[in-house]
A protein has these predicted regions:
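C-terminal non-catalytic regions of proteins with extracellular/luminal or membrane-system context
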Residues: 1-208
Length: 208
């Protein structure tokens, strides 16, 4: 039914969700309730499909190559609908960037599967965090893994240039400066990202 409706539409916007909470962990990174199958069917029927994700963390996107756009809205609150609509209709530039890494598969994670169930006393288990400080994007960088979307990733309706990068070290403090300029035709905000590493590579996860 969704596929037939999508085929008869000019474009389709699919809202997909994933519920997480302090006392409710997700069993895996797939969208629940067969939402991946729904998105796949809709995108197959209409290539002009956009997906809005309302999730609490990273999810897998097996349908990514078949859709025209993906907007990660997280849990946007009571005014989320208005904000999402303004972004989708181009009234405001999507200037945000990912604060986490979206893996291409669960196998890229340092611990894809946890054996046991912490909610059941007889199935509780200990976890040895052998990855140390190499968590999040630092794990992917350390292992040379290419994620689906890296930490700091974000698209925009405009473009930006960065010039005049300079670094100055004095009194134990590093100061970095450069100029960022909006070179496109749409008003927007650019997020400057600077990554530093030990020149001797002594730390277990090199960039931060």
């Amino acid at each position: 039914a969704a596929g037939r409706l999508a085929a008869a539409s000019d474009l389709v916007i699919v809202f997909a969700h994933q519920w997480t909470a302090e006392a409710f962990d997700v069993p895996n990174l797939s969208l629940p309730d067969n939402q991946d199958a729904l998105i796949t069917a809709v995108a197959k029927a209409n290539p002009h499909t956009a997906v809005v994700l309302e999730t609490g963390g990273a999810v897998l996107m097996p349908w990514l190559k078949d859709v025209g756009a993906v907007l990660e809205a997280w849990y946007p609150g009571t005014s989320g609908g208005e904000a999402i609509g303004r972004v989708l209709f181009g009234e405001v530039n999507p200037s945000g960037h990912l604060p986490i890494t979206f893996p291409a598969s669960e196998q890229q994670l340092p611990r894809p599967v946890l054996d046991g169930d912490p909610k059941k006393p007889e199935l509780r288990f200990d976890v040895n965090y052998s990855e140390g400080a190499a968590v999040g994007y630092k794990w992917f960088d350390l292992k040379g893994l290419k994620p689906l979307f890296p930490f700091g990733y974000g698209l925009s309706y405009t473009s930006f240039s960065h010039d005049g990068l300079a670094a100055h070290w004095a009194d134990g403090q590093l100061t970095v400066s450069f100029t960022i300029k909006n070179t496109g035709a749409v008003a927007g905000k650019g997020l400057a990202q600077v990554y530093v590493a030990s020149p001797k590579g002594l730390w277990e996860a090199p960039k931060r």
